[in-house]
Structures are given as structure tokens and as C-alpha cells.
């Protein structure tokens, strides 16, 4: 079997604000735990609204690109109140749109209901976050994305991507060598991120994209989508 190390985060009460120094340092400890974790299980009480403290913790998860599972606890009580999984999922998406890709588990911790599913989800996102993609495959996907929806001109200049490569895992980190990073609009980068999430085994984990200017002849040479098929990089 597999072993897991659980890092609890005592000292943070899910109130609308941090009431005192003890709770403040509890929040700091929780943020440090998020940085250490391979996977975060972010718990919400099905009987309460999402609090300011919840939002602060999720901000830390987003900032650190830590894989996470959103966990709605006390689900037995929610069922009794005729709450549905779809309604709670929509509530989470509306509140944390930046984590709309993260899986959601509905559990009752007191009885262990759906605990196995929660563990399986944690294992799944851990596996996804550790995947490595060959440079050839990555470049073919980016090339197709640029063909389908070219980045628009900005300041009368054409954004160009020369090649893409994955440089790290936990989180999956992809470097795009380009002419000028500032030419790529936020909306186009979101589009590319969506394509990568759809085409690669990173559907439920954060993907970190780094735009880097190519050193030297930044404005010269063919862009990725201008290369013929035979010139596509195939190495890992």
C-alpha cells in the first residue's frame, strides 16, 4: 500500500475575519503548510457560507500553484436540507473561478462517508502534477493552438512563440520562448492555458506558464506555427 503524510492546520477557525493574534498566526501556519504540501484538501462546511478566511487560504493555494481537492464536509446534513452536489459545486465555481478545474469531494468526516473517494482524488491530482510531457508533443499542441487562434497584434507588433518546453513538475511548469512576453494578452494566455489543460494530462491541477523572451535574435527566425512538420522538435 501507499503511505501518506497529513499536515493538519489547527488554529484557523472559519469565521468571516481573523479575530485575534492567535488566529492570525494560525493562518500564517496554514499558508506555510500549503507551501509544503503536495496536495491540499481544502475543507468547507456544507452548513456555512464560504468565509473570508476560506478565501484567504484559497488565495494562497492559487499563488503557490498547489494541487488541491475542494472538500465539502457534513454532506449528510446537506442531503437532509435537500442541498445538491451541483448547487454546491456551482457555488464553489462562482466563488473560486480560478480553481474551476479542481475536483470536488462531498464527504461526512464523522462517519467516513466518501473518504475513499477523497483519497483517490488526492492520488489522482498528485499523479497529474508529476506528469512530464515530451517537448515534441508540447510543441505540436502549442502550434495547433496558435493556428486555431493566433495571438492578436499589440502595439502594431506580432506576438511570436518560437518553442515550448516543460521545465518542472509540482506544478507542471511550461516555458514559452517568444519574441516579447508583454505582447501576449491575458485573454489569449487564458485561451492557451485552456488548450493545454484539455490536451495534456493536467486537467485537474494548476499549470504554470512562463513567457520568456528568446535571447539574441528575438525578432528573427520562424515562429512555431511557421515551421513545417518535418522541423518539429521530437525529443523529450
Residue ranges and their predicted role:
Residues 1-7, 11, 15-28, 32, ...:
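C-terminal-of-GTPase-core extension/linker across diverse P-loop GTPases
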